[in-house]
UniProtKB/Swiss-Prot annotation:
Record GO cellular component, one term: chloroplast
Domain of life: Eukaryota
Encoding gene, per UniProt annotation: rpl2-A
Keyword Cell division recorded: no
Gene3D superfamilies for the chain: 2.30.30.30, Nucleic acid-binding proteins, Ribosomal protein L2, domain 3
Protein name: Large ribosomal subunit protein uL2cz/uL2cy
Pfam families: Ribosomal_L2 (PF00181), Ribosomal_L2_C (PF03947)
Molecular function in Gene Ontology: RNA binding; rRNA binding; structural constituent of ribosome; transferase activity
Assigned protein family: Belongs to the universal ribosomal protein uL2 family.
Span of the signal peptide: none
HAMAP family reported for this sequence: Ribosomal_uL2_B
Subcellular location as annotated: Plastid, Chloroplast
Subunit annotation: Part of the 50S ribosomal subunit.
Main location as per UniProt: plastid
Length: 273
């Protein structure tokens, strides 16, 4: 998608970018309200996730992650903005009259045809089991459990690669660098998720960040000692510790957060980077 650069003398919007080719008028039957409870607070109102709060009200778009319209071709009608994710979404009009949203594959344009099922062509946007895909295929929206819907590689620009097949399992290299096993009966969509350059987008001002529900981030080194372990000192002082820590004194970088003895450990051949 082409990005438009604001040309304005106003400092607040200078060098901000916006995509003019993406619409934002969703279908009424494919949206519903969703209460954003807490916004970083727990049931007692205490902040448990920092730098969250506010933001514009959102309507949730019902995305078809299952792709269970078997052997029915559909046509891309619109490419729309979704406030609930970084990736764009496509409105698909199927031959039987059904309309559904899917994640926008990179390079797909209005008028393209997609289909899901077994023995379908290996082309962008088509969904089929891993057993029918050749090695080296770039895929996204990958199921972990058959029929549960895609759960892996769904963010903007995400793409995984099918690198091996042995027995009933397929080996995938995920965007994080993790190499894991998945059943060959699981569905996946061919191609890469669109909106690849979302991390290079310039919002132009702090207010645009607040509309997304993200509050300002303050460095611990500029706080007082009562507020952060990095705080205090005369002038611009270092953190005074061997390693950076969280506001509560725990290691901030490099600490593993995955649970030990998880059921899926046997399917992970190499951990993420």
């Amino acid at each position: 998608m082409a990005k438009h650069l604001y040309k304005t003398p106003i400092p607040s919007t200078r060098k901000g970018t916006v995509d003019r080719q993406v619409k934002s008028n969703p279908r009424n039957k494919l949206i519903h309200g969703r209460h954003r409870c807490g916004k970083g607070r727990n049931a007692r109102g205490i902040i448990t996730a920092r730098h969250r709060g506010g933001g514009h009200k959102r309507l949730y778009r019902k995305i078809d992650f299952r792709r269970n319209q078997k052997d029915i071709s559909g046509r891309i009608i619109t490419i729309e903005y979704d406030p609930n994710r970084n990736a764009y979404i496509c409105l698909i009009h199927y031959g039987d009259g059904e309309k559904r949203y899917i994640l926008h594959p990179r390079g797909a344009i209005i008028g393209d045809t997609i289909v899901s099922g077994t023995k379908v062509p290996i082309s962008m946007g088509n969904a089929l089991p891993l057993t029918d895909m050749p090695l080296g295929t770039a895929i996204h929206n990958i199921e972990i459990t058959r029929g549960r819907g895609g759960q892996l590689a769904r963010a903007a620009g995400a793409v995984a690669k099918l690198i091996a097949k042995e027995g009933k399992l397929a080996t995938l290299r995920l965007p994080s660098g993790e190499v894991r096993l998945v059943s060959q009966n699981c569905l996946a969509t061919v191609g890469q998720v669109g909106n690849v350059g979302v991390n290079q987008k310039s919002l132009g001002r702090a207010g645009s960040k607040c509309w997304l529900g993200k509050r300002p981030v303050v460095r611990g080194v500029v706080m007082n000692p009562v507020d952060h372990p990095h705080g205090g000192g005369e002038g611009k002082a270092p953190i005074g510790r061997k390693k950076p820590t969280t506001p509560w004194g725990y290691p901030a970088l490099g600490r593993r957060t995955r649970k030990r003895k998880k059921y899926s450990d046997s399917f992970i051949l190499r951990r993420r980077k």
